[in-house]
């Protein structure tokens, strides 16, 4: 039972080992392991072609083709090098978001520190990739073509700040959407339960709001999928900038 809307996002130690060094396994760690195991199982099915012609198999193939087309469309002929990374990240976010929709589960993607750290890691990887491929020429990315010489210092500063903000915005967008959606569902659900348990009239008047909560829940499932896809689109675009410098 949650006594505060924010209780569902609290990190709770499940196993605490204290000696010279404190080591703990939290609910975040547990769900991280669960999502990782599902991805390993999922990847094994694809790799060994165990899908068949079932609806499940068709769905997996559709997801695979969708992300492959996305990567090839964004990055071009070199997209195949980066497809495994983007496909894995898409599935990780998607599975984590869908698991978080199970009542009383834990939303990995709503941990802002974790998702921002994740996006920061990817951003650093993009910078390293750009420097590896282009050397100092990578910084030409911050100078738009055809820029008058007098405006170069200003535009370089603006472009550099815009590029640096990706390190936070990529993860913050994901975390904020999942966090706000789960808070909204829990707050509305708690209010409806309080209303319906107050009296018979309250029980009757709470039926219509329940339908609204059901609609919001369906919307949250859609957001869970969309956010994974948006994250993949943005990451593909950022990799394209590092590869092609535009």
From Swiss-Prot:
| Primary location | mitochondrion
The cellular location(s) given in this protein's UniProt record come to:
Mitochondrion inner membrane
Q: Which InterPro entries match?
A: ATP_synth_F0_asu, ATP_synth_F0_asu_AS, ATP_synth_F0_asu_bact/mt, F0_ATP_A_sf
Please give the GO cellular component terms listed in this UniProt entry. Answer: mitochondrial inner membrane; proton-transporting ATP synthase complex
Q: Propeptide residue ranges? A: 1-3
Query: What membrane topology is given?
Result: Multi-pass membrane protein
Cited Gene3D superfamilies: ATP synthase, F0 complex, subunit A
Which keywords describe this protein according to UniProt?
ATP synthesis, CF(0), Hydrogen ion transport, Ion transport, Membrane, Mitochondrion, Mitochondrion inner membrane, Transmembrane, Transmembrane helix, Transport
Report the transmembrane regions from the record: 21-41, 56-76, 82-102, 113-133, 138-158, 184-204, 206-226
Instruction: List, alphabetically, the SUPFAM superfamilies matched.
Output: F1F0 ATP synthase subunit A
Q: Does the keyword Transcription apply?
A: no
Family under the similarity heading: Belongs to the ATPase A chain family.
Q: Name one GO molecular function term.
A: proton-transporting ATP synthase activity, rotational mechanism
Record's protein name = ATP synthase subunit a
The keyword Ion transport belongs to this UniProt entry's keyword annotation: yes
Q: How does it assemble?
A: F-type ATPases have 2 components, CF(1) - the catalytic core - and CF(0) - the membrane proton channel. CF(1) has five subunits: alpha(3), beta(3), gamma(1), delta(1), epsilon(1). CF(0) has three main subunits: a, b and c.
So what does this one do? Mitochondrial membrane ATP synthase (F(1)F(0) ATP synthase or Complex V) produces ATP from ADP in the presence of a proton gradient across the membrane which is generated by electron transport complexes of the respiratory chain. F-type ATPases consist of two structural domains, F(1) - containing the extramembraneous catalytic core and F(0) - containing the membrane proton channel, linked together by a central stalk and a peripheral stalk. During catalysis, ATP synthesis in the catalytic domain of F(1) is coupled via a rotary mechanism of the central stalk subunits to proton translocation.
